[in-house]
Amino acid sequence: LFEVRLLLEGPMPRLPITALFEGVTDQAILSFMKVALKAHASLAHSGEVWYRGQANKDWNLLPGLFRSGKSASQEERAYREWTRRAELIEKPEENEWNHLFNMQHYGVPTRLLDWTESFAVAVGFSLVFSNFGETSVPRVFILDPCALNKRTTGRDRVFEIPEDKTISYRQTYLEGRGIMPTGPVAVRPSSYTLSNRRADNQAGVFTIHDNSGQPVDAQPKSIVTSFTIEKKQIPGARLFLKLSNVNAYTIYPDFGGLAGYIRAMLTNESK
């Protein structure tokens, strides 16, 4: 994304790539990129940058467990039931974190919030689930995970899970043993993505939240910021996705994603 600065700081070029979308002008894609770069500029930029696309600009950055009002006792029951029954479906999984990642992956409310290391994937999520701005105004959040962890744990790094033994999901968050970080913590499921194609394609990472239920967007704007994709920027954002080869199938590399990709292809051909 930052390579686009060179384009924005120089004279306005004529971009033949806009011919891929009828009616999309150079100004449309540059308008979208300028908004994104302006949001990036407000971060502390201590190292990595993560993204999250949401269909509705009014939604907070809360994980499913706190959006649904589930209690800690229900979380423990759900985890226990998952670990017991999951062994009947696949080979036994010994790692506590991989159980949690699988629960999140398949839609069980957890204290995890999904993020991605791919700007294009975040833009894709926000546009697709807002019907490209027709049902709501999409928003893309931008997070400095190292700055977040510095604030909530005192450690200026992302925790690589499960290799990093500093944090235990079961002991710290379920059983209440030890000291729970005050606020969300950025974690990377380093080995989990190797066995999960969807998580790998989405460049998936997470924040794990404490019992306060505080949303990530309550953090200072030097740690997390955002921008909305307004109606006038939608054409430029759609072209950006096309150039980035982001579609339903690249995000969801399974039969459901393939079906969504083909539906979109047929819809475009019928216009």
Identify the role of each PLM range.
Residues 8-271:
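Catalytic-core elements of nucleic-acid end-processing and repair enzymes
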